[in-house]
A protein has these predicted regions:
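Conserved active-site alpha-helix within GNAT-family acetyltransferase domains
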Residues: 129-130, 152-170
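Conserved beta-strand in the GNAT
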Residues: 91, 97-105, 112-117
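Conserved beta-strand-loop-alpha-helix junction that forms the acyl-donor binding cleft
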Residues: 123, 146-157, 173-177
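A short helix-loop-beta-strand connector motif used in the catalytic cores of GNAT acetyltransferases and
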Residues: 79-91, 112
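Conserved acetyl-CoA pyrophosphate-binding loop and the N-cap/start of the following alpha-helix
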Residues: 122, 126-134
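A short beta-loop-alpha structural element at the N-terminal edge
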Residues: 38-52
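Conserved GNAT acetyl-CoA-binding A-motif
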Residues: 132, 139-149
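Conserved GNAT-fold acetyl-CoA-binding loop/helix
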Residues: 51-80
C-alpha cells in the first residue's frame, strides 16, 4: 500500500474513488455522442494517455505565457509514472477516451493539487469542476488544499475562486511565467459533514 493509499484509507475516503456517472449536455462536435462521463482513479497503465492529454491541454498555457518549456510540456513518461507512487490520479472518461485528469498528494494536513487538465474540445463544460470536487472528496481529512497556476490563466483563477480558493502569493517560474499560489481551507463544519 502506497503512502497516498494509506492516507486516503485513514481519511475513510476510498468511497469517492468509485465510478461517478455524470450526464453530459448535448453540444456540437461529438459531445452528444458521450452520454456519460466517468470519474475514476487513474492507474499507471493510463500514464501514456494522461501525458499525451497533458501536453495537448497545456499548449494553450505555453502560448499564453510565450514559453514552450513549461514543466507540463517537458515531463517524460518515466517522470509521470513515478508520480503514481506518491500521488492520486483521477481521470474523466467519455466512452473509451480520457478527456480530463487531476493529481494530488497530501502531506500532513495539506493536499497539494496539481495539473488539472481537460481536453480542449471538452473545456468549459464543468469537467474541471467535477474533477476538483472529486479530489477534494478523496482527501476528505485534509485541512487545506493548495495549488498554483499562471497569473495569466484568468479562466483557471476564476474557476478556483468559484470553488473557494484564495490567492496566497506569486512567484516567478521563469522570465516569462509567473505563478499564483492559491489555497482553500476547510472550516470545521465542512470537515465534519464530509467525514460523516
Amino acid at each position: 500500500m502506497s503512502y497516498q493509499d494509506e492516507a486516503m484509507s485513514n481519511c475513510d475516503a476510498s468511497h469517492s474513488l468509485h465510478r461517478v456517472r455524470t450526464a453530459c449536455q448535448t453540444h456540437g462536435g461529438g459531445w452528444e455522442k458521450c452520454m456519460v462521463i466517468f470519474i475514476d482513479r487513474a492507474s499507471p497503465g493510463d500514464a501514456n494517455e494522461v501525458l499525451a492529454l497533458q501536453k495537448l491541454a497545456y499548449q494553450s498555457e505555453a502560448e499564453l505565457n510565450g514559453d514552450s518549456t513549461i514543466p507540463p510540456l517537458t515531463q517524460t513518461l518515466s517522470e509521470i509514472q513515478s508520480e503514481y507512487e506518491t500521488k492520486v490520479f483521477l481521470k474523466a472518461v467519455c466512452g473509451d477516451k480520457i478527456i480530463g485528469s487531476l493529481r494530488a498528494s497530501q502531506n500532513s494536513g495539506t493536499c497539494q493539487v496539481g495539473r488539472l487538465i481537460v481536453h480542449p474540445d471538452y473545456q468549459g463544460r464543468g469537467i474541471g469542476t467535477l474533477l476538483m470536487k472529486r479530489i477534494e472528496e478523496a482527501f476528505s481529512c485534509a485541512e487545506r488544499f493548495e495549488l498554483f497556476t499562471s497569473t495569466k490563466s484568468t479562466s483557471n483563477i476564476r474557476l478556483y475562486r468559484r470553488m473557494g480558493y484564495q490567492e496566497l502569493y506569486e512567484e516567478d517560474l521563469s522570465p516569462n511565467v509567473r505563478l499564483v499560489f492559491m489555497e482553500k481551507r476547510r472550516c470545521y463544519e465542512e470537515t465534519r459533514v464530509w467525514n460523516t
